[in-house]
């Protein structure tokens, strides 16, 4: 069984630095992700910026044989969508861009939702709710709280709005490795599960659906 790696204040400072660099990638992409761009161009622009401007490593590239630096998941694709030169963003689409970056030995992992052009009120409401649900989970984090407290906070906010939590995917510990312990579920019971302690670092990245929570997996080229 893998152990949870407790980070020192110095390690957390390095992780904050990696996170700040990743925020710069999204700030750059905010100007780039518009109607008419292909998801492969988003990938290529991000890779050039990470490597050339930030002198960092795209941590996803080569991980699990993944050949790209980010995932682009459009509309009903829950996560892990693959960039393509033929996938052009059109008005009305919602797209999640998920990027990892390593600097100084420590990895940052983040994603952002983009609404392309004019999206429907239903789509906008979904995007807003998943963001709010994520923050409900983040606000539950403190030493002495539990993973169940986080999951419950996310689940309650999403389900009160009529949405369902996707249960096949979860957050995770992060540090020198992209995926560390613990697994962070986005549903749960208050007071249940692992008790949080200072020095733990993990992601909270809920995925919610408008209707059923069910999702299916699709294979593309290679393992992706």
Predicted segments — roles?
Residues 1-224:
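Active-site neighborhoods and metal-handling regions in enzymes and metal-associated proteins
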């Amino acid at each position: 069984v893998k152990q949870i790696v407790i980070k020192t204040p110095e390690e957390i400072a390095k992780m904050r630095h990696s996170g700040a660099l990743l925020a710069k990638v999204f700030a750059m992409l905010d100007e780039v992700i518009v109607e008419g761009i292909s998801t492969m161009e988003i990938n290529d622009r991000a890779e050039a910026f990470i490597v050339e401007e930030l002198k960092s490593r795209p941590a996803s590239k080569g991980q699990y044989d993944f050949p790209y630096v980010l995932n682009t998941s459009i509309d009903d694709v829950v996560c892990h969508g693959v960039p393509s030169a033929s996938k052009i963003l059109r008005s009305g689409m919602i797209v999640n861009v998920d990027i990892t970056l390593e600097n100084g030995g420590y990895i940052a992992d983040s994603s952002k939702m983009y609404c392309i052009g004019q999206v429907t009120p239903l789509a906008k409401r979904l995007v807003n709710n998943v963001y709010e649900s994520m923050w409900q989970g983040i606000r539950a984090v403190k030493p002495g709280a539990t993973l169940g407290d986080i999951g419950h906070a996310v689940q309650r906010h999403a389900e009160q709005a009529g949405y369902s939590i996707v249960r096949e995917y979860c957050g995770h510990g992060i540090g020198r490795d992209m995926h560390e312990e613990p697994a962070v579920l986005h549903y749960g019971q208050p007071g249940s599960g692992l008790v949080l302690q200072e020095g733990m670092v993990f992601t909270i990245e809920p995925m919610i659906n408008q209707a059923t929570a069910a999702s299916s997996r699709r294979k593309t080229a290679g393992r992706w």
